[in-house]
Amino acid sequence: MAYIEGNTGKWEYVIGLEIHAQISSKSKLFSGSSTIFAANPNSQVSYVDAAMPGMLPVLNKHCVHQAIKTGLGLKAKINKYSVFDRKNYFYADLPQGYQISQFYYPIVQNGTMEIPTSTGDLKTIRINRLHLEQDAGKSMHDQSPHYSFIDLNRAGIGLMEIVTEPDISSPEEAAEFVKKLRNLLRYIGSCDGDMEKGSMRCDANISVRRSGEPLGTRCEIKNINSIRNIIKAIEFEAKRQVDLLESGEEIIQETRLFNADSGETRTMRLKEEALDYRYFPDPDLLPLVISDELINELKANLPELPDQKIEKYTKEFSLSKYDAEVIVADESVAEYFEKAANECNPKMLTNWLTSELFGQLNKASIGINECKITPSNFAKLVKLIENDTISGKIAKTVFEIMFETGKAPDKIVEEKGLVQVSDNNVLNTVIDEVIAENPESVEGYRSGKDKLFGFFVGQVMKKTGGKANPTLVNQLLKEKLSS
């Protein structure tokens, strides 16, 4: 467990998260308007989104399915009966004067997610609920010195709000939870998890306490927009609360905003309670009733999820848990890996994938889907190394050409004449030449200067243009030098 070091001793973090995940859907939660990102302002607004009188909401079935699939991925209970409620408050970018949400009877409850801790153990984070709700529009205050503008393109877009219990005990655990949840949503296809575009936003409820004491007064930090800022915001807010408590002041329950530039939180408003929103069932929407048949159908069609892939990679491919997690962290990488792993040694493939390929992708600032090397060609390269057709050193040269051109490795090896020299007679001839040309070094090695062995290996590799089989060179050199 992580602690905050105060002037009067240690304090514990108590953290709960609320994740707002924009549902991957071509249309909004209660209207047919498009959800394309960065469209011209107010170009994707229906009469329903603009709350014109007499316009009634119609529930998007696809959004419901996405929420159910996400609930299944979170090992949660899917409620067969749920209700939409009106959450009443006034914002300029909320034309209805209320938000349609689910307060009393959410669609999903009682889920769990396991995250790795700093000790290497797994920790279970309980998920209180997942409910459906509609997003608000966007207020823009920097377009004119005299006016604020409203863009309603986002108004009515479907959101899944995923709420954890206060089980998170450090900023790093909070970051791990969000990373793992984002990856799960991407595998399921229910949210793209792009925090920069705002399609996944995080609110953190933070309090501090002495070990063994009751929960303290919490403050909510709104709209944290990156993994890094989750850590920074929690660290700052927890330290702020500790400083107040140690100076004899009380924590005021409030909503605060995190400033990424200053790394500080500031007061936004006093924290509201449920009564302030006057929740009541939306009279324009019938209760949502979900059948066992639908749940079973969606469950049967779920893709293989990250934890399942990690288990498969460690058991079937004998990868370390760390390597499996690195590959599974990106669905595109996992898909690429599986296609290649069916044709070559998975462990050797992993080494090349996580070192050489990741390095080149980062250098070129591209994703694996933009890589010119096909999974099949990558597997061929690994097999050429496995079969001693080329050395690891030559393989790096071949790999660089493949990355630039997309050519098959066997073609490159053939064109460049890079086949590894593994003929004993040829290598013995080269070794004899090296020994004859360096009598003083031979005498030094035989008198106990073992480090000179590397010199002889280097000379053989130089004479063969780096194409000599290094394992065979080592074996033959030892025989020659010890005779």
Swiss-Prot record:
Keyword Ligase: yes
The protein's Enzyme Commission number: 6.3.5.-
Entry keywords, A to Z: ATP-binding, Ligase, Nucleotide-binding, Protein biosynthesis
GO MF annotation: an example: ATP binding
A Pfam family the protein falls into: GatB_N
One record GO biological process: translation
NCBIfam families associated with the record: gatB (TIGR00133), PRK05477.1-2 (NF004012), PRK05477.1-4 (NF004014), PRK05477.1-5 (NF004015)
Family, as annotated: Belongs to the GatB/GatE family. GatB subfamily.
Descriptive protein name: Aspartyl/glutamyl-tRNA(Asn/Gln) amidotransferase subunit B
Organism annotation: Rickettsia africae (strain ESF-5)
Gene responsible for this protein: gatB
